[in-house]
Amino acid sequence: AYTIAEGLAMVKAVRNNKRVLQVGSQQRSSREFQAAIDMVQNGAIGHIEKIYARVGEPPTPLSLPEMPVPANLNFNQWMGPLNDPKIHYHPDLCPPISLDPEENEKLWGAWRWFQETGNGYTADWGAHMFDIAQAAIGMDGSGPVEFTPKGYNGTQYSTMRYANGIVMTEQPYLEDNPDAQGIKFVGDNGWIEVARGYINCSDQSNIPSDLKNLIEKRPRMMTPEERKKMYEEYMKKLKDSKKKGNDAGNYETSAPHMQNFIDCVRSRENPIAPVEVGCSTNTLCCLQNIARELGRPVKWNPATLSFGNDKEAASHRLYWYQYRNPYSLPYFCK
């Protein structure tokens, strides 16, 4: 979803039509993130006071030069409902993907880095890292109540404040690797760091034994072989724990993310990352970018899904914008 409204419409569409939707928040099916969530929720580091979540840079205005549209591309259809006249074709926006002949994109589509077409790293990696923070502190389906952009009154980083007082800051969590995407939970009795293929804690005895090998690893993307081995080991441990009648925890899963989705299509149960989870995380990312573009704090009521009396924020395109014909947004009433 590019806007808050699109996320809200997706929730209604899924629930009204009794569908099963799994959001691509695959970190929720990753053992290291599940362990971090459990440690936070079980009080391993005490009361959570702040969260550092490094995701990357926000979007910038479209800066790619206009180029001729290839004859085999319907660029008008590719744009969909976007109505910004400044959007023009450049091959980096939509790298070619083809099944016949087979061709995979050689770079990430640059549409995600520009504010006319995407939400930058704020949503690209924020959809993953902010999502884990939301899960750990019990804010699924909800979110922060105030967003303050970087640079406002001299602030060094953008911040998000929850009603319970917890403040999440988009800033580096590793001093020696400031660009590494990941999360650091800081409590009144220690800290937990987690990223893809990495986990650490101020008290390392809290880290499950099957993850001890990740303590010394620097944040990176795990190989498919490592991921497969980790799941096999974890699934065996989970099976053994169930035989003993132990509770595996709210965020544990005995299957990878896509298998979890397939299983839920069959069972009609909610998957590990249902549509409401994706909506609340997307809303958080959009609100951070709205505050950044307005250059001031923005207050949000996650219960009423409104900006209160802030008409400027409510009229921002990242909340809702008028689609161009023939597109419309069902299931959403402005």
Regions found by a protein language model. Name each.
Residues 1-29, 43:
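Beta-strand-loop-alpha-helix segment that lines the small-molecule cofactor/substrate pocket
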Residues 34-35, 47, 52-276, 282-334:
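Contiguous beta-strand/loop segments that form the cofactor/metal-binding neighborhood of enzyme cores
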